[in-house]
Amino acid sequence: MIDFLLEKFPVRCELRDGSPCSIRPLEATDEAALKEFHHVIPEREQLFVRNKILDGSLFQEWIADDSFESNLPLLAFVDAKIAGLGVLAQRQGGWKRHIGKVAFLTHPDYCGQGIIDEMMKLLVDFGAHYGMTRLESELNGERKSAIKSMAAAGFQELVRIPEYIQDMNAQYHDYVLMGIELIPDFENLGAGD
């Protein structure tokens, strides 16, 4: 369904500091590089990362979905190293099937350099093509750079609940839900939409 969209990869762009960046979907050969990437994410960010990412099972789940029907994980590379990860997740049914979920992680050396901005454009395009009418992202309130990038891309803060979520050390943090309305590719809308 998305083969013609995948033909645009790799997408090349320039970060704010002038570094060349290349973005493409996750490949089976990326497992070691992705593990290395997760190990450089600061401890304060790791407190919010799902364990499935750290233990490698999420990577296996993503690779098994080689048609990208459920998840589209994108990797941003700078100097042949992963500088960012962005994922679009599509619910396969139910009352929220029209709402995609996006999530991002950025290498600490590249925070604030526009990686999220570049991946966001691509994931918004894919979401519209999938027939999604909205995208949402759940964040902790401390992710100020990510919140700023998402707002610049048109996302609005839908909900902020103070001291609502707990990190892996049982410390409370603000919960933030951001969302954007899409203009979907209507030929790809599901029945009942």
Protein language model regions, located:
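Helix-loop element at the rim of GNAT/NAT acetyltransferase active sites that forms part
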Residues: 17-18, 31, 36-50
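Glycine-rich phosphate/pyrophosphate-binding loop shared by adenosine-nucleotide-utilizing enzymes
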Residues: 19-21, 79-85, 173
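Acetyl-CoA-dependent GNAT
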Residues: 51-98, 103, 107-108, 181-183
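Conserved active-site alpha-helix within GNAT-family acetyltransferase domains
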Residues: 113, 117, 129, 141-160
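Conserved GNAT acetyl-CoA-binding A-motif
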Residues: 120, 127-139
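Conserved catalytic-core motifs of GNAT/GCN5-like acyltransferases
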Residues: 136-139, 151-173
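C-terminal "cap" of GNAT-fold acetyltransferases
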Residues: 163-193
